[in-house]
Amino acid sequence: MTIIIDTVTYDVDIVSLDETCDFLDKYAERTEDGILHRELIGCYFNQQIQFGSPTNSAQRADLAALWLVLTEAVEFHTVTVPDADGVPLTFTAYFANVKRSLRKDTAAKTFWKDLTVNFIAQSPENTP
């Protein structure tokens, strides 16, 4: 499966993809009578993706390049990822909670696994 970030395609396996719909309010306040009053900004589609361990040298190179992009000090990126139904979804996002785990370290190479990232949408998918 592929993922596209800022027009660059990365051929990496996706082992899990969790999509959330987060509602953001301009304000939300509960009055003394217990009623919630709110002004909804919109619904943001955010994703958490876990990438699998590479199975060949090309995937290993793509995973290393993906790590560098995910850890750049850049405010926003254009990403295209499959949504929960496998349909390509393109949106502007920032990256959060980027992490990977050490699989094996040798004198010649370091091998990583379980690269995980959260894509947080810049703007809402749906608005009132």
Question: Residue spans of the language-model regions?
Answer:
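Extracellular/virion structural assembly segments
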Residues: M1-P128
